[in-house]
Amino acid sequence: MRVFTAILLILLVLLQYRLWFGKNSVPDYLVLKENVVRQQSANEKLQQRNKLLFADTDDLKLGLEAIEERARNELGMIKENETFFRLIPKENSTRNVNN
């Protein structure tokens, strides 16, 4: 009976050692779980970005309004008989005023 108890105790110690310090132990599991959560968050952000890019691509394929908007904003293009006004912001500089 004592031998059986000793063998069970040794097996318990070995299994506990592997559980806490061996390969694929509890600390390794916790690190991997944290990495999975971080990667899922990054994937969600990328999926949202992809949805926006697909919507933008579809808009460019189907409608001329998006092309016109990009041409105006990025290239500064204007239509015929249109007047372009460029507003330059006033600088906030201090001037010496002689009184």
Curated annotation (Swiss-Prot):
Record-level GO BP terms: FtsZ-dependent cytokinesis
Coiled-coil stretches noted in the UniProt entry, renumbered to this chain: 29-53
Mode of membrane association: Single-pass type II membrane protein
GO cellular component labels: cell division site; cell septum; plasma membrane
Alphabetized UniProt keyword annotations: Cell cycle, Cell division, Cell inner membrane, Cell membrane, Coiled coil, Membrane, Transmembrane, Transmembrane helix
Topological region Cytoplasmic: 1-3
Phosphoprotein as UniProt keyword: no
Transmembrane segments annotated in the record for this chain: 4-21
Subcellular location per the Swiss-Prot or TrEMBL entry: Cell inner membrane
Periplasmic topological domain: 22-99
Family named by the database record: Belongs to the FtsB family.
Purpose of the protein: Essential cell division protein. May link together the upstream cell division proteins, which are predominantly cytoplasmic, with the downstream cell division proteins, which are predominantly periplasmic.
Subunit note: Part of a complex composed of FtsB, FtsL and FtsQ.
PANTHER family the record matches: CELL DIVISION PROTEIN FTSB
Name recorded for this polypeptide: Cell division protein FtsB
Originating species: Colwellia psychrerythraea (strain 34H / ATCC BAA-681)
Gene transcribed to yield this protein: ftsB
